[in-house]
């Protein structure tokens, strides 16, 4: 039995939903919805941020194998910029729940608000540390997004994306100012917008 997680909430057809990637300056926001199988418990579930990368990777495979149903979804950079990050996150969560091949009786959403869903839903603050299905969803979402950021490191070298995963670290902000935004940067985010405006200003001065 794991301290901190309420295993009474591992019930038939309860989906846990979480997101990763609201704060970064680049890349998609990734969500996951997971319905765990009470007959096939997964040991070691916890908030993905509290686990090592190796442990997350191992749990990712175990969750995919043992869950009754799971779906990983996303909202792309273009959607984030057109909708705003909150609405894009809600859309991505909605896609994750709708993508489950089993309809849950209840969706438990990490955080303090719920997307519009066709099934009953409830928010759970710090749910990734309390509800096993939300913890599982956080692991699927984080591993998926981290893998994407590692791939972008090869496509857009010089930004350190593989290390900071797109978050606004000093290394990232310095590279953004020096190299300018890439196509995967969120132009609606202030540091990216500022770097883009500087870039456009330089271009205009050369015309």
UniProtKB/Swiss-Prot annotation:
Keywords: Cytoplasm, Endonuclease, Hydrolase, Manganese, Metal-binding, Nuclease. It is an enzyme of class 3 (hydrolase). Gene3D superfamilies: Ribonuclease H-like superfamily/Ribonuclease H. Its EC number is 3.1.26.4. Its main location: cytoplasm. GO terms for biological process: DNA replication, removal of RNA primer; mismatch repair. Its cofactor is Mn(2+); Mg(2+). GO terms for molecular function: manganese ion binding; RNA binding; RNA-DNA hybrid ribonuclease activity. Endonuclease that specifically degrades the RNA of RNA-DNA hybrids. This is Ribonuclease HII. It comes from Pseudomonas putida (strain ATCC 700007 / DSM 6899 / JCM 31910 / BCRC 17059 / LMG 24140 / F1).
């Amino acid at each position: 039995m794991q301290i901190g997680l309420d295993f009474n909430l591992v019930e038939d057809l309860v989906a846990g939903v979480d997101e990763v990637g609201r704060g970064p300056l680049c890349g998609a926001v990734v969500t996951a919805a997971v319905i765990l199988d009470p007959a096939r418990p997964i040991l070691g579930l916890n908030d993905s941020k509290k686990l090592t990368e190796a442990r997350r990777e191992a749990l990712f495979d175990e969750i995919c194998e043992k869950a009754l149903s799971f779906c990983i979804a996303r909202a792309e950079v273009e959607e984030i910029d057109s909708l705003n990050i909150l609405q894009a996150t809600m859309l991505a969560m909605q896609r994750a729940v709708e993508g489950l091949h089993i309809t849950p009786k209840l969706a438990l959403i990490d955080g303090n608000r719920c997307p519009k869903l066709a099934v009953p839903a409830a928010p759970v603050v710090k749910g990734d540390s309390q509800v096993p299905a939300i913890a599982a969803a956080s692991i699927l979402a984080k591993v998926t997004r981290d893998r994407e950021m590692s791939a972008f490191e090869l496509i857009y070298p010089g930004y350190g994306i593989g290390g900071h995963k797109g978050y606004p670290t000093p290394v990232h902000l310095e590279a953004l100012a020096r190299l300018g935004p890439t196509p995967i940067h969120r132009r609606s985010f202030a540091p990216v917008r500022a770097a883009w405006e500087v870039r456009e200003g330089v271009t205009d001065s050369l015309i």
